[in-house]
Amino acid sequence: MSILVNSETKILVQGITGQTGRLFAERMVAGGTPVVGGVTPGKGGALVAGLPVFDTMREAVAATGADAVLSCIAPAYVVDGLYEVVDAGIDLAVLYIENIPVHDAIKMCAYAKARGTRILGPNSAGAVSPGRANMADLNDANLRPGRIGIVSKSGTLTYEV
């Protein structure tokens, strides 16, 4: 059973041209996760891991029908980046970003909640439906489909399970 992501989820990687975003995109594509593109301002038209890169989230959603985002952008840009994600109509945002001030996290969560976007993070390990979609920092080789799911507040502790 999948709750947050599955084989029908259309995922964008925000910050796809950065080192972390590129590594996630390559791993997700190789694992069969339904990634449809990425967003990095000023890099529209490029390809990363065979995926199209767009300049804005609205442009990416219009072109791909994406409904989920894995955000791998620098902490200094995360508030504006999340607002762009929410305003583009994304249903789920996974914020794989550390060192976000508490007040920024509170603002982002309130903004997203008021507009119907679910957030995992900041500092989230992500979301996985084994064998269907993996938008997390968890290795597919260690995951199996089944009846049991795990939710963790701590990405680091999730690795121990």
Predicted regions: what they are:
Residues 1-161:
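Catalytic-core regions of core metabolic enzymes
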